[in-house]
């Protein structure tokens, strides 16, 4: 978090990471600098508390955006009603997601992708069984008629 762009560039170039996922106070100048240093995708996380936070996310020069609660590891979601009908750009959804609420998130607010962390951990470490259950939940929902009829294409 808040590492110098050159440090993130090094991690991308040596293959340690493949996407720069920014969760700090990185501003547009930082994102543009990092993008000038590498061809790897840059993802910026935004804490969503009100509609204006969505405007900031939509305006970001990051290749990808992640919409989050902002309080990591609490298991809390933000107010998803803020995203209902929001189609300004594809986004990853994070914050409080678990196998029980993933179907609701997909059906209700149509994220392009999901980001799971503490919900698939046991004692602070990734739990293979929890990960497999989450993947199974998404795949089961993806194969449903509702998902196929409502999948959005952005251009």
Regions found by a protein language model. Give the residues of each.
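Ligand-binding grooves and catalytic loops that recognize ribose/phosphate and carbohydrate rings
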Residues: 56-64, 107-111, 133-139
């Amino acid at each position: 978090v808040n590492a110098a762009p050159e440090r993130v560039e090094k991690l991308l170039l040596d293959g340690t990471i493949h996407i720069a996922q920014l969760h700090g106070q990185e501003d547009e100048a930082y994102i543009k600098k990092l993008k000038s240093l590498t061809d790897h995708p840059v993802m910026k996380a935004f804490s969503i508390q009100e509609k204006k936070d969505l405007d900031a996310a939509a305006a970001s020069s990051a290749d990808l955006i992640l919409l989050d609660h902002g309080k990591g590891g609490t298991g809390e979601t933000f107010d998803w009603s803020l995203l209902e009908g929001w189609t300004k750009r594809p986004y990853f959804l994070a914050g409080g997601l678990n196998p029980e609420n993933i179907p609701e998130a997909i059906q209700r607010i149509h994220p392009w992708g999901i980001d799971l962390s503490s919900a698939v951990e046991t004692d602070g470490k990734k739990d293979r069984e929890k990960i497999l259950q989450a993947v199974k939940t998404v795949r089961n929902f993806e194969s449903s008629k509702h998902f196929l009829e409502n999948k959005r294409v952005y251009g």
